[in-house]
A protein has these predicted regions:
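Conserved PLP-binding catalytic core of the aspartate aminotransferase-like
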Residues: 307-339
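Conserved beta-loop-alpha segment that forms the PLP phosphate-binding cup at the N-terminus of a helix
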Residues: 75-102, 106, 110-114
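Active-site C-terminal subdomain of aminotransferase-like
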Residues: 36-37, 212-298
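Conserved active-site segment immediately N-terminal to the catalytic lysine
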Residues: 200-212
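PLP-dependent enzyme catalytic core of the Aspartate aminotransferase-like
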Residues: 7, 11-14, 27, 350, ...
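A glycine-/small-polar-enriched, mobile loop at the entrance of the PLP active site in fold-type I
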Residues: 24-82
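Active-site phosphate-binding strand-loop segment of PLP-dependent enzymes
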Residues: 135-191
């Protein structure tokens, strides 16, 4: 028997198999994702399978790609691939970066973007902020001016769901536009579809998201919007991600109207159904609905607790609330789950008991979010 390499850390198994049952209670999801999915969207996944090289697949894939462009208001290319948005942490780094990356870090997911780039062998400089604070565009300018390096990419997070911070990516993109050799990639996993951003107007070379957040679709697909400059950069660079390469995916779409590899067709059928609903609602109305939910939760938090993020930089899709009353967050979550069949989240990492988080995105409304806050008030005796 071959021995495992000594460089691999050996750990004990975390748990034995826990049998999945058929009788779980349904819970209404107010977590930072996945979020609620409409019954008709779930039903769309039950169509009989068909071949991923059939004309029917071309009809499906071109529909969801072009409808996504329309919804987001972009003339840039759109890629929809099976996988998590995490895939594009790797793909953007491999496609755009020769050596140097600047990552403004202000929470768990921006830090993870930096970690991914380091694992891919890139030279990463961090512009660090205390958790709860937002990235400041002028700090990016100072970092770009002060460095003797030419950064290939600035990697930003639009919506830091670990802290409930919404970073000003529009202004960040405007600053980075002054540095033509530096590309701007944005993780918008927990905000795109629920917080409008004019992608084409603000030098955003790549922006990517996942279906299970504000798009209110089942997990399993990643959406990526790619500028012509980013596409050209990958071609010039000559090396890229195999699975998430811009040239490979976009060229295959232009030639065939399909994905280069077998996709999760049932989830794409659900995507088509939900995107039709999103187009019917309209991005402006959807954005306003999310803003109304944000304002409701903020007013509620101000009455009973406090908002954790820096004022003026609060997320439009995920509220991170400071536990100023010292409630038992874990016990409150469990009791709300048990008594009301509603799920919300504790704080992230070290903030587990200091904060709690409410996902108010996707198909939620002020009325549905109020049902959760009423339940929290009841259980926590606020």
């Amino acid at each position: 028997t071959r021995s495992p390499p000594s460089t691999i850390q050996q750990v004990d198994p975390v748990t034995d198999k826990r049998e999945y049952r058929d009788d779980y209670d349904d819970k209404t999801l107010y977590i930072p994702g996945p979020t609620e999915v409409r019954d008709d969207v779930i039903e769309a996944m039950t169509e009989a399978p068909f071949g991923h090289r059939m004309d029917r697949m071309t009809d499906l894939y071109t529909t969801i790609v072009e409808d996504t462009k329309t919804f987001l208001g972009t003339d840039n290319d759109v890629i929809i691939l099976t996988g998590s948005g995490t895939e594009f942490w790797e793909a953007t780094t491999l496609n755009l970066v020769d050596e140097h990356v600047l990552v403004p870090t202000c929470g768990a997911f921006s830090e993870r973007y930096a970690n991914v780039a380091e694992r891919l062998g890139k030279d990463v400089d961090r512009l660090e902020y205390e958790w709860g604070n937002a990235v400041k565009p002028e700090d990016i300018r100072e970092a770009l001016d002060a460095s003797d390096k030419t950064y290939d990419m600035v990697a930003g997070v639009m919506n830091e769901s670990s802290t409930g911070v919404r970073n000003p990516i529009e202004e960040m993109g405007d600053v980075i536009s002054e540095y033509p050799d530096t590309y701007f990639a944005v993780d918008a996993v927990s905000s795109l579809g629920g917080d409008y951003v004019d992608i084409d107007a603000h030098n955003i070379d790549v922006i990517f998201a996942s279906t299970q957040k504000a798009f209110a679709m089942p997990p399993g697909l990643a959406i990526c919007v790619v500028s012509q400059d980013a596409y050209d950069r990958e071609v010039e660079k000559g090396t890229s991600s195999w699975y998430g390469g811009f040239r490979r995916t976009i060229d295959y779409y232009e030639r065939k109207g399909q994905t280069h590899s077998t996709p999760a067709i049932p989830i794409m059928l659900a995507y088509r159904k939900q995107m039709k609903r999103m187009l019917d609602e309209g991005h402006a109305a959807r954005d306003e609905r999310h803003r109304e939910m944000m304002e409701y939760v903020h007013d509620w938090a101000d009455e009973h607790f406090a908002m954790f993020p820096e004022e003026g930089y609060e997320s439009q899709t995920v509220a991170c609330i400071e536990n100023t009353q010292g409630i038992d967050v874990a016990a409150t979550i469990d009791e709300v789950n048990e008594e009301y069949d509603m799920a919300f989240s504790n704080g992230y990492g070290d903030l587990a008991e200091e904060t709690f988080r409410i996902g108010h995105m996707g198909e939620h409304t002020v009325e549905s979010v109020k049902a959760l806050t009423d339940a929290i008030e009841d259980v926590a005796e606020l």
